Each structure stands twice: as structure tokens, then as C-alpha cells.
């Protein structure tokens, strides 16, 4: 039996070699044909290809010039004008932070005048928080959701504040979505437990006590040293009594 098996294996092996060589022989002319066709295409369309290549290079150069000579100076100007509005914001003078005063622009004008700059992008965050504190929740949401930042702390704050605005509007489904995003985005021991606790409260408002229990228990297990964990057992006991 062993010898028969070996003979069959050897026969199959020889057959495979023959097939592989046959396939290689078949591929060669096809590959040569394809190469020839490519070369002919390049020769016949050399002018068009050169034009396309030149156009791409021109577009790259225009973009670099646009960034350097247009966006760059506007970025500096917008950043310089942000300082006074930020000072109003820090002092909780929300109206002046939004609209500015006689001498300096507020965040709204900075967005309007320098909308494609990093400074204007950050202004969306400041403006959203200002409207949130003024109780203008829809405007807060509009501005906070326009913020596109790479900084995790600011981005998490923007998401969490958006959730706060939805809570005030009693749109608990969207509040839940944004608190989840905020907790995940923050991914730290300071903000994440805070947003998890708020998420638990939103679940409770919707009578989803199981999900609330999960959120509170996550604080207990993952963030035991956070301020939110201090009395979290009371929250857990409360929702578990309703399960």
C-alpha cells in the first residue's frame, strides 16, 4: 500500500510540474503582448499623458501656494483675534464672547471671516459652549457638531457638551449616543467616568435600568479612584432594585 501511494504521489508530482511548465509557456506570450500594448498606448498618448502630469504638478503647486500665501497669513490673523474673545469666554461674558465688542470680534465673526482656518474651527467649540451656558441649546449643538479637532480632550468635551444640550432638549436617544462617543473619545480617568455617569442617568431617564447598571459598574471596576466612584454603589443599588 505504501509503494502504491508513493507512485501515485510521484505521478501527481510529475503531472503538476508538466502543468506548471505548460501554464508558464502560455503566460509568456500574453505578458509580452500586454507589455507591447502598454508601450503602444504610452507612445500614442504621450502628449495627453504629459498634459495630465503637468496639470497634476500645477495643482500641487497651486495648493502649496494657497496654503503658504493665503491660509498661512489668515491663520495668524485669526489666532491673534481669538485672544480677546477667549478672555471674554473665560470670564463667562458669553454675549461678548459670541459677538465681541466695539474693538474686537467675537467667535461668530472669526468663524464668518476665517472659516477655513484652525482658529475658526476652535471657535466653533468656544461658541458652542457659550450658547450652551446661555440656554440656547440648538445653537450650541450646531456649533459643537461643527468642531473638527484632533485634540482628544477638546473633542471629548465637544461631544459631551453636545450630549448635555440634547439632555436639556429631552432628546435622550441622541444624548445617549453623544455621551457614549464622549466617554470613548476621552479614554482617560478624568472625563470618561464623568460621561459614563451621565450616560447612566440618561439610561435611567429612559427606564433602561440594565444599561444604567452596566454604565455605573464600569465606573466602579475601571475607574475606582475617580470622584464619580465615591458613591457609585448607591446608584448601582438604585437601578438594581428596579431590575
Task: List where the protein language model places each region.
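Short solvent-exposed coil/turn linkers within tandem alpha-helical repeat scaffolds
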Residues: 72, 111-120, 134, 148-156, ...
